[in-house]
Amino acid sequence: MSFNRPPNGVYYIRSAVELRAFVNLLKKFKGYATTLITLYINAERPIPDVVNLLRSEWSTAANIKDKTTRTHVQDTLERIINNLKGEAKAPENGMAVFAGFHMINQGNYEWVYYVVIPPQPINTFKYICDTAFHTELLEDQLHAGVVYGIVVIERGEAVIALLKGGQWEVVKSVEFFVPGKHHAGGQSANRFKRQTEHLAEAFYKMVAEEANKIFLQIPTLKGIIVAGPGPTKEDFLEEGGLDYRLKDKILAIVPACCANEYGVMEAIRNAQEQLKESEYVKAKEVMDKVMYYAVKKSEYLVYGRERALKALEMGIADIIVIAEELGEDAVLEVIMKAEEKGIKVEVVPRGVEESKTLMQAFGGYVALLSTPVWVLEQQLSIAEAAQR
């Protein structure tokens, strides 16, 4: 089967969204018998050692009885060796090589060679010959992305949420009766105050227990945001008994209106600086920039597929912004063309509010330009005139 794909080459993948699109592409390729080679090289593995191993595999492949399989495997190994020769070591995050002859149909083959530099380190060395490429180690990076914990707490109510990739969700709500302040005087007031403090402390311990249970099970937990109105959040940290390992991960204590979904959104907004590695916050920052250009620098912005890709083709785009919702083919098309021109791409993940804005207001494509839009308009007019 034949399909559109990026040209063979080296691809530096910067985000989980781009990685997801590339993984889905790699899964489409099929080899004749076990002729597709997957090679994962961690940064610590010397490339000369890898080349020696591949030469040994080339010699072993000479014993394969089927001529097509033997030819494809040896040819693929030879090409990988030639590309790796002269290199001393892999990049800091390692590299994944996917190479071989994709079977379009019986007797009709297409050479495929991709080197993927992933956003997170490859920690092992693997060499695999199979009928398909093995993407498991790359997929592990998708599942093991950075996770942030969020606790929003007010008097008698709390929510615990997780922020992962481009999405967040409330995973636990806690409610407990804690009376309001009592204004009467005397002994009864003092007794009431002590009872209220006791109930508040019991509530904080309940919330801490739930937070400990949830957060300690997440090995990729990057940090925790604690939020809420007034001093309740500080009282919770002081009296609740949050596990010391989690206390060490607290990135920020920020104000938030209330212990519900609106409070979670406000907590994320108020802790943007601490959450800057999150896809959710990155998407918001990208779309904030797009909206700034749309309002203040509209002469340096174009949108829609045709105009954005034309700006990319002409090399006058500083940044291309595309919605993941458009599909992997569209995303890979932009990544491929931008790689050739050295232009930065920002992929807004599906599921975030900013993706809806990008799709509905801009058709899923935006180009932020290095030159005024009239330069692009002039080129489009010339192209239209030439077609008449």
Curated annotation (Swiss-Prot):
InterPro entries xref list: eFR1_2_sf, eRF1_1_Pelota, eRF1_1_sf, eRF1_2, eRF1_3, Peptide_chain-rel_aRF1, Peptide_chain-rel_eRF1/aRF1, Ribosomal_eL30-like_sf
Major location category of this protein: cytoplasm
Q: What does this protein do?
A: Directs the termination of nascent peptide synthesis (translation) in response to the termination codons UAA, UAG and UGA.
Q: Which cysteines are joined by disulfide bonds?
A: none
Q: How does it assemble?
A: Heterodimer of two subunits, one of which binds GTP.
> May I have one GO cellular component term?
cytosol
| Designated name of the protein | Peptide chain release factor subunit 1
Is the keyword NADP in the record? no
Q: Which domain of life is it from?
A: Archaea
What does the similarity note say?
A: Belongs to the eukaryotic release factor 1 family.
Q: Where in the cell is it found?
A: Cytoplasm
One MF term in the entry's GO annotations: translation release factor activity, codon specific
Q: Which UniProt keywords apply?
A: Cytoplasm, Protein biosynthesis
